[in-house]
């Protein structure tokens, strides 16, 4: 086996569909509703592991988990007019109960700012109760009219983590935005997923937000995918829903809010970014199975049984040390067939144990990411596997960051930017004066989408690619999902 990444990069869509199906992560396209898939047991365990990282980081920073109803009345959803305009073409509506028409249409939750603010209005009365941080992990529904894609563009987003916070002042809410950004950085670092962090321009903010900050990553085909967003909502939703609190000075005022979300796309990025032509390479931090033991049969039945017994013993040693391990005891498949199966599942480490290892009380270790191998004594296997898992995690992270950085280009000419994007460059940064008019023109001329501009100050000694005035920053442009 050699490491190749041709199919992974040049035919990514086919590669991704193949991995989800053959790796038994997610069955998509066969459930009889467009844009909805089924999490299979192996993929569901990966999903659980990723959710666990998210949940632990939120819980440890004072967030409290809640669970809201799926249905939102139309009159409530429309209370924040900018918000509903941003979603009205994407809402699924329930219009009947049994055979009777409903008096008020009910929306399948597209997001929960309005619903949660409604209840916060009942629960929170004073600055003494603030800050308040809620979150839930639920399904949301969007009536996508574009071509749907498994995990990437869905009508039911099954893993939507949405956090909603309430604060006395604008500055308090801004500090929460900064905390949320740091939480997301930790999440993506745990997943070994690289990103660029941008502030979305005014014409592409979340509906009803004052500011939107987005995490984007570059997929194998050069297209960019949004993997997380953080929104400073100001008083827009509290004002629309007449939600007031008593402030420290005794006055009543609308509190300031934030919201931030992560979806199935984070899981898609974990599967996609660390892959090769043989399948995904799951980071050990979230891999459902960290080690697979593949017994190599002996020339006789008795020898094969002894190899199997030794293989099971090694696997039990690892499991007792909290290293998730399985032994592939399928007698109908050859070792080569088993290698194929576990490679497409992205298991980080394979142990091969045959008569030679049995006779010498050793174990043969094979890394999935770079194919390096080691032979270690039985008593050393636990420590060596732990060491190798840590190395794989760090190497995947480094490789992914290096790849992302290599796919960010700078162009001070609009034609150059367009050509780079047409050749799957990834992200192109162009000098920009800061005006909406020029930003929209950049989108039009490059036939791409503006991601936003860096949140840190970026001095640009150049001219805007459109108006030729002095540039204030760079604008990031990409082909996107």
Swiss-Prot record:
EC number(s) per entry: 6.1.1.15
Leader sequence residues: none
Record's subunit section: Homodimer.
An example Gene Ontology biological process: prolyl-tRNA aminoacylation
Catalytic activities: tRNA(Pro) + L-proline + ATP = L-prolyl-tRNA(Pro) + AMP + diphosphate
PANTHER family: BIFUNCTIONAL GLUTAMATE_PROLINE--TRNA LIGASE (PTHR43382:SF2), PROLYL-TRNA SYNTHETASE (PTHR43382)
InterPro entries: aa-tRNA-synt_IIb, aa-tRNA-synth_II, aa-tRNA-synth_II/BPL/LPL, Anticodon-bd, Anticodon-bd_dom_sf, Pro-tRNA-ligase_IIa, Pro-tRNA-ligase_IIa_arc-type, Pro-tRNA_ligase_II_C
GO molecular function, one term: proline-tRNA ligase activity
Keywords attached to this entry: Aminoacyl-tRNA synthetase, ATP-binding, Cytoplasm, Ligase, Nucleotide-binding, Protein biosynthesis
Highest taxon listed in the record's lineage: Archaea
Gene3D superfamilies: Anticodon-binding domain, Bira Bifunctional Protein, Domain 2, C-terminal domain of ProRS
Positions in coiled-coil regions: none
Free-text comment about domains: Consists of three domains: the N-terminal catalytic domain, the anticodon-binding domain and the C-terminal extension.
CDD domains (UniProt xref): ProRS_anticodon_zinc, ProRS_core_arch_euk
Cellular location(s): Cytoplasm
Protein name: Proline--tRNA ligase
Naturally occurring in which organism (per UniProt): Saccharolobus islandicus (strain M.14.25 / Kamchatka #1)
Function per UniProt: Catalyzes the attachment of proline to tRNA(Pro) in a two-step reaction: proline is first activated by ATP to form Pro-AMP and then transferred to the acceptor end of tRNA(Pro).
One Pfam family cited in the UniProt record for this chain: tRNA-synt_2b
One GO cellular component, as annotated: aminoacyl-tRNA synthetase multienzyme complex
Gene it is expressed from: proS
Similarity comment: Belongs to the class-II aminoacyl-tRNA synthetase family. ProS type 3 subfamily.
């Amino acid at each position: 086996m050699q490491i190749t990444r041709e199919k992974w990069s040049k035919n990514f869509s086919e590669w991704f569909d193949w991995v989800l199906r053959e790796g038994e992560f997610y069955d998509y396209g066969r459930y009889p509703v467009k844009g909805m898939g089924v999490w299979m047991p192996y993929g569901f365990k990966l999903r659980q592991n990723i959710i666990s990282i998210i949940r632990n980081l939120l819980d440890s920073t004072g967030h409290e988990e809640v669970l809201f109803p799926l249905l939102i009345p139309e009159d409530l959803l429309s209370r924040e007019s900018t918000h509903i305009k941003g979603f009205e073409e994407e809402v699924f509506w329930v219009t009947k109960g049994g055979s009777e028409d409903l008096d008020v249409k009910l929306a399948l939750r597209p997001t929960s700012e309005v619903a949660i603010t409604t209840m916060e209005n009942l629960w929170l009365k004073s600055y003494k109760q603030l800050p308040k941080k809620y979150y839930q992990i639920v399904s949301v529904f969007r009536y996508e009219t574009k071509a749907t894609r498994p995990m990437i563009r869905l009508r039911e987003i099954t893993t939507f983590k949405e956090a909603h916070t309430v604060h006395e002042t604008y500055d308090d809410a801004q500090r929460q935005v900064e905390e949320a950004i740091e939480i997301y950085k930790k999440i993506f670092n745990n997943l070994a997923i690289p990103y660029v962090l941008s502030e979305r321009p005014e014409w592409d903010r979340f509906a009803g937000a004052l500011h939107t900050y987005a995490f984007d990553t570059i997929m194998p085909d050069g297209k960019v995918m949004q993997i997380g967003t953080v929104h400073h909502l100001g008083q827009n939703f509290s004002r629309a829903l007449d939600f007031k609190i008593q402030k420290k000075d005794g006055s009543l005022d609308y509190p300031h809010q934030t919201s931030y979300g992560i979806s199935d796309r984070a899981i898609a990025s974990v599967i996609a970014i660390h892959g090769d032509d043989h399948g995904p390479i799951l980071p050990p931090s979230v891999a459902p199975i960290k080690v697979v033991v593949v017994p190599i049969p002996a020339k006789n039945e008795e020898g094969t049984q002894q190899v199997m017994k030794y293989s099971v013993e090694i696997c039990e040693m690892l499991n007792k040390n909290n290293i998730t391990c399985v032994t592939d005891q399928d007698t109908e498949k050859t070792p080569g067939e088993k290698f194929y199966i576990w490679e497409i599942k992205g298991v980080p480490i394979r142990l091969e144990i045959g008569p030679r290892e049995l006779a010498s009380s050793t174990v043969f270790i094979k890394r999935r990411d770079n194919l390096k191998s080691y032979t270690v004594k039985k008593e050393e296997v636990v420590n060596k596997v732990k060491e190798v898992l840590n190395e794989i995690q760090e190497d995947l992270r480094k490789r992914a960051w290096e790849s992302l950085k290599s796919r960010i280009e700078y162009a001070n000419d609009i034609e150059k930017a367009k050509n780079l994007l047409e050749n799957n460059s990834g992200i192109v940064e162009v000098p920009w004066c800061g005006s909406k008019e020029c930003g929209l023109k950049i989108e039009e001329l490059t036939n791409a989408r503006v991601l936003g501009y860096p949140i840190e100050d970026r001095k640009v000694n150049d001219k805007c690619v459109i108006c030729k005035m002095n540039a204030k920053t760079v604008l990031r442009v990409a082909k996107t999902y």
